Amino acid sequence: MKLVQTAIPDVVVIEPAVFADSRGWFMESFNEQRFHAELAKLGLPVPRAFVQDNHSFSHKGVLRGLHYQLPPHPQGKLVRVVRGAALDVAVDIRKGSPTLGQWVAVELTATNQRMLWIPEGFAHGFMALEDSTEFLYKTTDYYAKDCERCIA
């Protein structure tokens, strides 16, 4: 697992180690111990434990987001595409942050197998670039309807 900081250093691309041979391929899609160790090497805080996994299916051109949750239920998200492709976007909405209002976009595909770590305090969204795109994300807090917000 290799972590690469984006233009907003707290948002990190995760490139998993993929082992391929004539039978196909294998990868660890998540390893908490390694994830935390790699974040620490970058001087980034370790997130709260993941408590919910979500799975979405989108047709090409569908835009989802930009969503976030207010305290006391902010969500950090670890996201990936398992089928198709998406342009994934994180916008810094943290008050007092030196990167407040800045955004990063990363193409996540089933082929490149990258993931994106988006900490609490960011609005998040994506657009499906291919038909039948399936998107998985782990969150550090449960969905809380009363705390959910959207930037349209």
Kindly give the residue locations of the regions a language model identified.
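A short beta-strand-loop-alpha-helix capping motif that often carries His-Thr
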Residues: A123, F135-K138
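Conserved metal-binding segment of the jelly-roll/cupin
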Residues: L108-E130
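Non-catalytic, conserved peripheral segments adjacent to functional cores
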Residues: M1-T111, E130-S132, T139-A152
